Amino acid sequence: MLERIVLGLGSNKGLSDEMEFEPVQILKMAVIELQKIFLPKDFFYSSVYKSKAMYYEDQSDVFNMVVSGFYDGTPQELLHQINEIEANFGRNRLNEFRNGPRTLDIDIELFGEKIVSDANLEIPHKKIKERQFVLIPLLEIFPKCAEPISGVLFSDILAKLPDQGVEFFCKLDL
């Protein structure tokens, strides 16, 4: 069954190979890769926002955005696909520390109206309601979106959060 998915993307660490890719370039390339796993119709992506890192602050600013599209598969299948995309952009889950710098971090924020609580996956994302860096870009593309468990509008949740210094950075040109 087709489900509308919302993914949160973040990057604050460049990728070196033959070329140097900065975080915003990584986000742009990740959006292009993510378009391949979603149905082509009704694929949306937000602007890029910049903020200080949360939880572990001794690192570079983080660039965040959300993407949304329709997906024909299970949450676990999607998790596997996004983990592969993260790895292709240099993420090594075995050699990183929690909330540390990332070349690319992709979180499943929403999977239609599904509620999932597994050992390796929680949907809606367990921290979505505390993260302005997710809520601001989410509301940019879906201003009337509601939290599926409580039904509370994300705009109302955002209004109650303290300022976390999330700033508009740029629109991507794909």
Predicted regions and their residues:
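Flexible, gly/pro- and Lys/Arg-enriched active-site loops
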Residues: M54-V62, Q76-H80, E84-L174
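Short beta-strand-to-loop capping motifs
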Residues: S11, V67-G73, L110-E113
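Residue-level signal for inorganic ion chemistry
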Residues: N12, Y45, P137
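Acidic/polar residues at beta-strand termini and the immediately following turn/coil
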Residues: L15-S16, E147
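Short, surface-exposed acidic-centric catalytic microdomains
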Residues: P23-P75
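Short, flexible/disordered intra-domain loops and linkers
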Residues: D17-P23
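Extreme N-terminal starter segment of soluble prokaryotic enzymes
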Residues: L2-V6
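Generic N-terminal amphipathic, Lys/Arg-enriched alpha-helix
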Residues: L7-K13
